[in-house]
UniProtKB/Swiss-Prot annotation:
It catalyses: tRNA(Leu) + L-leucine + ATP = L-leucyl-tRNA(Leu) + AMP + diphosphate. The gene is leuS. Pfam families: Anticodon_1, tRNA-synt_1, tRNA-synt_1_2, tRNA-synt_1g. This is Leucine--tRNA ligase. ATP binds at K615. Its EC number is 6.1.1.4. It is an enzyme of class 6 (ligase).
Length: 851
């Protein structure tokens, strides 16, 4: 055994051995209980960052721990490889997105291997590979057959300068991120997945996800947004048109004095009178440049325009003006709102602004509301007035009665509405999965026959940054023979939203080389659900919801038996670091600040707050440099020790150095005692300091096991091992009890193995074991060793600590009380005082009350 801890040499040695032995390969036919551990796979940006290190270190602890416990662990890794960054890089660096992506994958794979993560690399997938996306295309075709995929018109972000559709994240301050042109809403034909067919099941099944954080479940429930109410038909005056309105407040129907429609409503232009046309068109053009999220925020300026048309309130025949309003969206309800200004604050403000009449229809029992003097809407419960036969009813009771009345009259119906909208999956992008559809002038929309899959993404394209998808200009790809009639036809040039790839990758990992379909039914049913999924909470209502939807769809397509993809979910916190800046050079990298000065100009650097590590603010740490300086085990240890997994981690160099010193200390403890403990065993009976050390060893085993298993309290688990190492260094009876010292050192190595596997494998071998740590398994604690002969009791006088005493663990309260009254340093606080009461808390403390 070398005297000094050489992190680089040790880590290289064990990583090579693990790869040669395929140590982490999951076995298909295995009697052991399965455990599927998965972290959200990364986009291959080119380099891993400290967020990756933390996320994957958390997962690796669990995977290694479960493997040591005897589970057959599946722990795969792959690449969410399609997406816009590759196209942007292609434009910037004049390279092909595929070349850029695969080079990045190679680089990041090497980085992950340097971290020593226990991945089964035989199961690696890249979603940009045809052998992955061919099966995604097949799933789409099956969904099309079932009516779960369809095409319709939808509004998208459109840059008129670039002549292309922009994703939401490409819209910055209402403008195109590339050219600065104001973005508008444009109606295009898009493909959709009918996730709304599963809205109720997705909502109901959140109750089954007891292993998920409640905030994630709450976000999903709110996103699905189930509400019960009425759909009401409002006839348009002097026409045959009807406007459908969804409301949860049918109790206020008699108070509707105007209607608000989304600017994108399909009837918007049909409702416009000649005299209002110019103003309405200008309004619609303006609204289409406004961010949808901002339009509904409370502080956004509410605007509207009168269409020149009137609706008819179906319960009282009142003519009410129809407005277009910027705060109404097509994304909720029907895109049309019956506006009751006296009982909705937004409608109240709008009515005051545009001088629209108001009618009170709900008021408190002891008060009469007057619209002329009201300063805000009345939104509390009350009694109906001005509501014909329903006057006098409390408004909650009136909801049911008015709903029944609407159904009787044939002008409305009780219904359930969801905030959730069908998932638009079309992207006018090149670097994505081609949608397997052919357009034929004679046959219309024709699915690509299954035997012709995959529809390959052509690689001989030039990414120029010009408007539109390059696929639309690629004649060999575009022109095709119709499989139905044999005539000339063209391919769909849209590609799938990249969230489609990540909605089923966890299933493909179970059988990544299966060639007869997306998944092998028996294999996927064995491995799913994922026992532990780990990733960021920012994916709560996109990826995590879509993955649940896809699982249910694949179940209904007969591809798997499971209802849910992920049994347990851990959402880890961010990695944060102080920012630093210079008046001359702006944001600075950490290495550009030395002794508080900018190394570029010598100016005093300004230190900012701790923020999420980001390239833009340069508060980043390069994992490669960290590994080079300290080793992968130190990087892993700090990322696990500095904060609980679900909390944000604040980076500091001193903490990293402390973890590095700790590993040196563990190494030294084994090195210094190796010769003495060689070949010895724990004696049958021990006492004194040896018994205390054994007790701490087994208490630590018990604590670390509980902290890892299910709770993920890695920081406290590591802290308890650090305390054990301190006890090892303080064990003065090691020459008398070398077997106890050996047990303590071996326990330390085994307990640290999931956290810092390289150094622990090396130390385990140094301790004379040939089988490796996995062969040894996870240590079990001995309950007998935990039994205490003595306890240390704190003694207080009038609530202040005045001494401690050591007493037999089984001493009764009288014995403890008498010993406390005679304890050193306690007696002097009792002199001249009267003892009024003695309170004994068994096993912990004695409080003597005197006066």
């Amino acid at each position: 055994m070398e005297e000094r801890y050489d992190a680089g040499g040790i880590e290289g040695k064990w990583q090579k051995r693990w790869e040669q032995d395929r140590t982490f390969k999951a076995k298909e036919k295995d009697a052991r209980e399965k455990y599927y551990l998965l972290e959200m796979f990364p986009y291959p940006s080119g380099r891993i960052h400290m967020g990756h290190v933390r996320n994957y270190s958390i997962g690796d602890v669990v995977a290694r721990f479960k493997r040591l416990q005897g589970y057959n662990v599946l722990h795969p890794m792959g690449w969410d490889a399609f997406g816009m960054p590759a196209e942007n890089a292609a434009i910037q660096h004049k390279t092909h997105p595929g070349k850029w992506t695969y080079e990045n994958i190679d680089n990041m794979r090497a980085q992950l291997k340097k971290m020593g993560f226990s991945y089964d690399w035989d199961r690696e997938v890249a979603t940009c590979h045809p052998e992955y996306y061919r099966w995604e295309q097949l799933i789409f075709l099956k969904m099309l057959e079932k009516g779960l995929a369809y095409k319709k018109s939808s509004f998208v972000n459109w840059c008129s300068e670039c002549q292309t559709v922009l994703a939401n994240e490409q819209v910055e301050n209402d403008a195109c991120w590339r050219c600065g042109t104001v973005v508008e809403q444009k109606e295009l034909e898009q493909w959709f997945f009918k996730i709304t067919d599963y809205a109720q099941e997705l909502l109901d099944d959140t109750s089954k996800l007891s292993g998920w954080p409640e905030p994630v479940l709450t976000m999903q429930r709110n996103w699905i947004g189930r509400s019960t109410g009425c759909e009401i038909d409002f006839p348009v005056a002097d026409s045959d048109l009807k406007i459908k309105v969804f409301t949860t407040r049918q109790d206020t129907l008699y108070g509707a004095t105007f209607m608000s429609l989304a600017a994108e409503h399909p009837l918007a232009m049909e409702l416009v009178s000649a005299e209002c046309k110019a103003e309405v068109e200008a309004f619609i053009a303006r609204v289409r440049t406004q961010d949808k999220a901002k339009r509904t925020s409370d502080d956004f300026v509410k605007e509207g325009v009168f269409t020149g048309s009137y609706g008819i309130n179906p319960v009282n025949g009142r003519r009410i003006p129809i407005y277009l309003a910027n705060f109404v969206l097509m994304d909720y309800g029907t895109g049309a709102v019956m506006a009751v200004p006296t009982h909705d604050q937004r409608d109240f403000d709008f009515a005051r602004k545009y001088d629209i009449p108001m009618i009170v229809v709900i008021q408190p029992e002891d008060q009469t509301l007057d619209p002329a003097t009201m300063t805000e809407a009345w939104t509390a419960p009350g009694v109906l007035v001005n509501s014909a036969p329903f006057d006098g009813l409390d408004n909650e009771s009136a909801k049911e009665k008015i709903a029944a009345h609407l159904e009787e009259q044939g002008v409305g119906r009780k219904t359930v509405n969801y905030r959730l909208r069908d998932w638009g999956v079309s992207r006018q992008r090149y670097w994505g999965t081609p949608i397997p559809i052919i357009y034929c002038p004679a046959c219309g929309i024709v699915p690509v026959p299954e035997e012709d899959l995959p529809v390959l993404l052509p690689m001989d394209v030039e990414i120029s940054g010009e408007g539109g998808s390059p696929l639309a200009r690629h004649q060999e790809f575009l022109k095709v023979t119709c499989p139905t009639c044999g005539g000339d036809a063209r391919r769909e040039t849209d590609t799938f939203d990249t969230f489609v790839e990540s909605s089923w990758y966890f299933a493909r990992y179970t059988c990544p080389r299966f060639e007869q379909g997306p998944v092998d039914r028996a294999t996927v049913d064995h491995w799913l659900p994922v026992d532990q999924y780990i990733g960021g909470i920012e994916h709560a209502v996109m990826h995590l919801l879509y993955a649940r939807f896809f699982t249910k769809v694949m179940r209904d397509l007969g591809m798997m038996a499971h209802d849910e993809p992920f049994k347990n979910l851990l959402t880890q916190g961010m990695v944060c670091m102080e920012t630093a800046s210079c008046p001359e050079h702006g944001w600075l990298f950490p290495e550009q600040v030395v002794e508080g000065k900018c190394v570029l100009c010598g100016a005093t650097a300004q230190t900012g707050r701790n923020e999420k590590m980001s390239k833009s603010k340069k508060n980043v740490v390069d994992p490669d440099k960290l590994i080079l300086s300290y080793g992968a085990d130190t990087a892993r240890l700090f990322s696990l020790f500095a904060a609980p997994p679900e909390k944000d981690l604040e980076w500091n160099e001193q903490g990293v150095e402390g973890c590095y010193r700790f590993l040196h200390r563990v190494w030294r403890a084994v090195y210094d005692n190796l010769e003495m403990i060689s070949g010895v065993a724990v004696p049958a009976s021990v006492d004194g300091a040896a018994r205390n050390l054994r007790r701490q060893v087994h208490a630590t085993i018990k604590k670390v096991t509980g902290d890892i298993d299910g709770r993920f309290h890695f920081n406290t688990a590591i802290a308890s091992v650090m305390e054990l190492v301190n006890a090892i260094y303080g064990f003065e009876a090691k020459a008398q009890y070398p077997g106890v010292m050996r047990e303590a050192l071996e326990a330390t190595v085994r307990l640290l193995a999931p956290f810092v596997p390289h150094v622990c494998e090396e130390l385990w071998a140094c301790l004379g074991h040939e089988g490796g740590l996995e062969a040894a398994g996870w240590p079990a604690w001995d309950e007998e060793a935990l039994v205490e002969d003595e306890k240390t009791i704190v003694v207080q006088v009038n609530g202040k600590v005045r001494g401690k005493l050591t007493i037999a663990a089984d001493a009764d309260n009288d014995t403890v009380q008498q010993a406390a009254l005679k304890a050193d340093n306690v007696v002097r606080f009792l002199e001249g005082k009267t003892v009024r009461k003695v309170v004994v808390v068994p096993g912990r403390l004695v409080n003597i009350v005197v006066s």
